[in-house]
Structure formats: structure tokens, C-alpha cells
Amino acid sequence: MEICKRVEQVDFEKMNGLIPTIVQDYKTKEVLMLAYMSKESLNKTLEDNTTWFYSRSRDELWNKGATSGHFQYVKEIKIDCDNDTILILAEQVGAACHTGNRTCFYRDL
């Protein structure tokens, strides 16, 4: 299926143009992070095979790893049954979390 048709099936309207995106290590299946994608960031992710997200606080797109070198190389992208959440299986280089931890989910509640 071509890229534009795949993107069109995603329901960006439920959350005002954004969609929650879970990133998981493609080998270990460890959950690395959750971020939000816009249609534009999903298109950029599909085009260059690294993760692009939408920063709600900065109101801009960002490429994971562009500053830190901790890129996420996309291996597979899945969408849930409601077409409103994305799961990305990726090869993580270095830490996924801005704190320097491998995963953003390193604390117990």
C-alpha cells in the first residue's frame, strides 16, 4: 500500500490532529516511550525511516536523535483497531528518554 493511503487510514481528528505513538524496541519488545505524531510527522517518519514527533509544548516537529544522536530507526509500524494509536517497533540507538535512561518508563508508581 502506498504511503499516502496508509496515512489516510489514521484517525487524527479524535485528538485535534495528533495521535499517541508508542515506541517499542523491535528485538526485546521493551516499551521505550510515548509521544504524539501529527500527519506531517508520520509522513516524515515514513519517508526517512527515523521517528518524527510533534512537540505539544514547543508546537513544532522534532526528529528523535537529531540533537542527542539517539536515533530510532523504524523497523515496523502498526496501527490499533480504532485507527487512533500507532505502535512503532524501532532500533533504538542509545537512550530513548531525555533523562539518559534507555526507556522513559524506568520509575515505579
Swiss-Prot record:
Keyword Metal-binding assigned: yes
Transmembrane feature ranges: none
Top-level taxonomic group: Bacteria
Pathway: Amino-acid biosynthesis; L-histidine biosynthesis; L-histidine from 5-phospho-alpha-D-ribose 1-diphosphate: step 3/9
Keyword annotations: Amino-acid biosynthesis, Cytoplasm, Histidine biosynthesis, Hydrolase, Magnesium, Metal-binding, Zinc
Family label: Belongs to the PRA-CH family.
Protein name: Phosphoribosyl-AMP cyclohydrolase
Lineage: Bacteria, Bacillati, Bacillota, Clostridia, Eubacteriales
Gene name of the record: hisI
